[in-house]
Amino acid sequence: MRALSDWFIVDFDDKRIQIRIVEPGTPSKTEILWKDIIRVCYKTGSFLESDEIFIFVKQRPESYLIPTEASGTTDLWGEIIERNLFDAKEALNAVLAEDHTVTCWPPPK
């Protein structure tokens, strides 16, 4: 079985995030513009589960899900924090939270 990082790939530049699925039979590519992001959530997994990043944009009610085991996700998480789309202190708390804890930025009103 191939590792998730072999077929789920995340790249970004100054304008967009690109999510590519290169699994045979189900290739796809999605782009998310930085300027369209309205909320980011981080969900901790358990010992055998990947943590997950959820990105919400203006144009759709559902989020984009990016498992932290995907290739490029560590750099993406750093860029999300650098762009102030997630508070740095809260990001540390989110990553260290108990299993299955969801932390969002900005926090719910």
What are the functions of these language-model segments?
Residues 2, 13-44:
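Phosphoinositide-binding peripheral membrane targeting modules
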Residues 28, 38-109:
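Acidic, Ser/Thr- and proline-rich intrinsically disordered linker/docking segments
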Residues 1-7:
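Extreme N-terminal tail/first-helix region
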Residues 7-13, 56-57:
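Short, exposed beta-strand/loop patches in secreted or surface proteins that constitute
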